[in-house]
Amino acid sequence: MANETMGIALGMIETRGLVPAIEAADAMTKAAEVRLIGREFVGGGYVTVLVRGETGAVNAAVRAGADACERVGDGLVAAHIIARPHREVEPALGNGNFLGQKD
């Protein structure tokens, strides 16, 4: 069974607070051709923002998002890219619905 997201990278930025998360999301989507797939309120004020796209674009987007987040105080907790998430990871991402979004 073919998976349309195979070969598509996943970029994640975790922040301390909503304002750095919004700043990171804005910078990521402006910096490269990526799709913002959502955000997750992790708890304790932590927010994770996720993007998908080609590996190079996601890499550039996550760098830009992390830089932007750092300019908003000490909001950056972590930034990470998974170049080709294994197909078993995809169900954990869902359709974006667990992120509070609807298709």
Swiss-Prot record:
Entries under InterPro entries matching the protein: Bact_microcomp_CS, BMC_dom, BMC_shell, CcmK-like_sf, CcmK/CsoS1_BMC
Name the source's superkingdom.
Bacteria
Give the GO biological process terms.
carbon fixation; photosynthesis
Q: Name one Pfam family in it.
A: BMC
What up-regulates or down-regulates this gene?
Answer: Transcribed during light cycle, reaching a peak after 6 hours of illumination, mRNA becomes undetectable during the dark. Part of the csoS1-ccbL-ccbS operon.
Q: Where in the cell is it found?
A: Carboxysome
Among its keywords, does the record have Cytoplasm? no
Q: Which GO terms describe its molecular function?
A: structural constituent of carboxysome shell
Show where the BMC domain sits. Answer: 9-94
GO cellular-component terms in the record?
Answer: carboxysome
Signal sequence bounds? none
Keywords from UniProt, A to Z, are: Bacterial microcompartment, Carbon dioxide fixation, Carboxysome, Photosynthesis
Q: What is known of its domains?
A: The tight homohexamer forms a small pore which is positively charged.
- Which family does this protein fall into? Belongs to the bacterial microcompartments protein family. CsoS1 subfamily.
The free-text function statement in the UniProt record for this protein reads: One of shell proteins of the carboxysome, a polyhedral inclusion where RuBisCO (ribulose bisphosphate carboxylase, ccbL-ccbS) is sequestered. Assembles into hexamers which make sheets that form the facets of the polyhedral carboxysome.
Its subunit composition reads: Homohexamer with a small central pore. Forms a CsoS2-CsoS1-RuBisCO complex.
> What is the name attached to this protein's record?
Carboxysome shell protein CsoS1
The protein's organism comes out as Synechococcus sp. (strain WH7803)
Taxonomy of origin reads: Bacteria, Bacillati, Cyanobacteriota, Cyanophyceae, Synechococcales
Q: Which gene encodes it?
A: csoS1
